[in-house]
Amino acid sequence: GFGALFKFLAKKVAKTVAKQVAKKQME
């Protein structure tokens, strides 16, 4: 259903944001 899709997208976004934050902290 829609809930599963939303959870999947939320996980993807969280991973991407985590990567961006890690990059900024390394600089």
UniProtKB/Swiss-Prot annotation:
Keyword Secreted appears in the UniProt entry: yes
Tissue expression profile of the protein: Expressed by the venom gland.
GO CC, alphabetical: extracellular region
Modified residues (Glutamic acid 1-amide): E27
Family: Belongs to the cationic peptide 04 (cupiennin) family. 03 subfamily.
InterPro entries: Cupiennin
Coiled coil location: none
Full protein name: Cupiennin-3d
Keywords carried by this UniProt record: Amidation, Secreted, Toxin
Subcellular location as annotated: Secreted
Transmembrane segments: none
Gene Ontology molecular-function annotations: toxin activity
GO biological process: defense response to bacterium
Primary residence: secreted
Secreted is among the record's keywords: yes
